[in-house]
Amino acid sequence: ARDHANVLALQNDGKILAAGSEANSNASSAITPSLYRFNADGSVDTTFGNGGRAVHRFTGNSAGSLYGIKVLDDGRILVTGVSSTIHGFGAMQFLSNGQLDTTFGTGGIARINYSMGGHSVASLFLPDNSILMATVDISPTNIVLARMDSFGNPYPNFGNNGVVETGIVGKY
């Protein structure tokens, strides 16, 4: 397996979270969004998820990766990323034990479908636990913003179903 960590967060108890992806082969479809947890001493926290990792796809067999992470006040973990197969923005919410939080999105996973070519996503977690994400689209190459509420629903009054094509040229 080839695992990648794209972003880190620290829990109040000193445990370390790393979000990124794992790939079991060189095929792009084999890249799966993944969340890992380590103890304060750097050892794998085997009590988290499945042996220290929580691996879930945004939908079906879609490839993707995680690029944002926030530990919520109650210990739940909110992550954001991209699904390159369905070309969309995504978020997942986990309980502190690494299981999906089924009160978020659909079964713990939320998506905003948008044909963006599967690029990395910058994320801003707002004080009300809503999420603002940005990426660069392939065609046309412009910066695209997406916003979800704290339950994983697209903001209806933010662009078109939660997505704004800014018209500002970006670099792919």
Regions found by a protein language model. Give the residues of each.
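Extracytoplasmic mature domains of secreted or surface-exposed proteins
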Residues: 1-172
